[in-house]
């Protein structure tokens, strides 16, 4: 903040709350105004992957690109109407944001970030739904979501609706005074990262029922002497996975 007083949080405590949001731009209308989509939560967004639920609601998968942060999913209240731009403009304004918990038995749950539900109450320091969204990380902490190894890009397979998410790395996993390993983040000092995947109940991205998950790939050199740094990928060794996408043939 030595260059701009606005970033001195002691003087302007709400200035940080301006950052960490998804902003939607209409590429078809150069006169349009970008819109901040606060319902998608405030955190260190790494992409926003859009899918449609079986009943036409809009689903947005997001990772919080920081050590020990979370995977999120937003499900809109309204339904997408093909070819009706005006009707679809506000779909990302109303809906429920969820945070993921990956359990050791290979199941997972989407936990709703809704004010007044569970621990997200005024008694626990959450004044309103706006407060929950502004402090999405704290809300995830309160709900007991799974702290991940820097979740970044997310891609939904066009074949079978598996969802893939990159965990770039986390050299602090298992360090002193830091969270230890768990089923979804199984390597201490995870310098090479991994890719996790899950399949929503019924193959429906909009489902909030329990899902099944597994680790798709552990990154690193398959010949590395240290098992904690050894990859299991056939082919070229790679580490710190970041972006991923599916081509029209369904190849990741």
Predicted regions span which residues?
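Conserved small-residue
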Residues: 1-252
